[in-house]
């Protein structure tokens, strides 16, 4: 399975957010360890016109990575407990990123169980803080490139547009009208139920 090319991340942020669904995130933190998960849920964030974005006001030391080249890894620590994984998507100097909200475990599941301290596979990666814990993703990856590290993306399965739901983002209090959350219909690993009725509800059909 080939890696996702650099130009993929230069597409508009909302396009990347949807196109990431079905892609395989791979992390090889050290020899003999390999984690893989299929992305099933994302959220887009933009510095311009999006008050829920960390960079909506100005660049700060914390959010400066969001202004780097597309394909840069942006990891931030939140709620005093969780590392959240984002991928930078806008041209250098313009803030924008896609949050990886949930994934379906593919490889390294037994190791993920140990990292998450649970035997329930359904709970391994069904949330942005859970998936980073499961895959040993931390602030050490912040600012790295998906093309030059042990954390990278592989081409996975193309998800038909009719099988993708679009809703408001979860857990925010600003810019709640923006329908910038994308997830695969009926996938059990999605982080939580939609905050509003989904735009469409159809049986999943995967395109090869």
Curated annotation (Swiss-Prot):
Superkingdom in the source lineage: Bacteria
Keywords of this entry: DNA damage, DNA repair, Hydrolase
Record EC number: 3.2.2.-
Any one biological process term the GO annotation gives: base-excision repair
Pfam families membership: Pur_DNA_glyco
UniProt enzyme class: hydrolase
Entries under CDD domains matching the protein: AAG
Gene Ontology MF terms in the entry: alkylbase DNA N-glycosylase activity; DNA binding
Record keyword Amino-acid biosynthesis present: no
Family indicated by similarity: Belongs to the DNA glycosylase MPG family.
Protein name stated in the entry: Putative 3-methyladenine DNA glycosylase
Organism expressing this protein natively: Prosthecochloris aestuarii (strain DSM 271 / SK 413)
């Amino acid at each position: 399975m080939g890696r996702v090319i650099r130009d993929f991340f230069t597409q508009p942020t909302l396009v990347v957010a949807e196109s990431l669904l079905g892609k395989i995130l791979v992390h090889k933190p050290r020899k003999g360890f390999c984690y893989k998960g299929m992305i099933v849920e994302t959220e887009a964030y933009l510095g311009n016109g999006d008050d829920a974005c960390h960079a909506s006001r100005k660049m700060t030391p914390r959010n400066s990575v969001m202004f780097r080249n597309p394909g840069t890894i942006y990891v931030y620590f939140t709620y005093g407990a969780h590392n959240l994984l984002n991928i930078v998507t806008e041209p250098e100097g313009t803030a924008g990123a896609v949050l990886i909200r949930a994934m379906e475990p593919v490889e390294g599941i037994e190791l993920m169980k140990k990292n998450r301290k649970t035997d329930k596979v359904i709970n391994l990666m069904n949330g942005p803080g859970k998936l980073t814990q499961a895959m040993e993703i931390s602030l050490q990856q912040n600012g790295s490139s998906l093309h030059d590290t042990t954390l990278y993306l592989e081409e996975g399965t193309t998800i038909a547009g009719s099988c993708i739901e679009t809703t408001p983002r979860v857990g925010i209090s600003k810019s709640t009208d923006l329908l910038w959350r994308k997830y695969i219909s009926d996938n059990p690993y999605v982080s939580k139920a939609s905050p509003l009725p989904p735009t469409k509800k159809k049986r999943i059909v995967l395109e090869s």
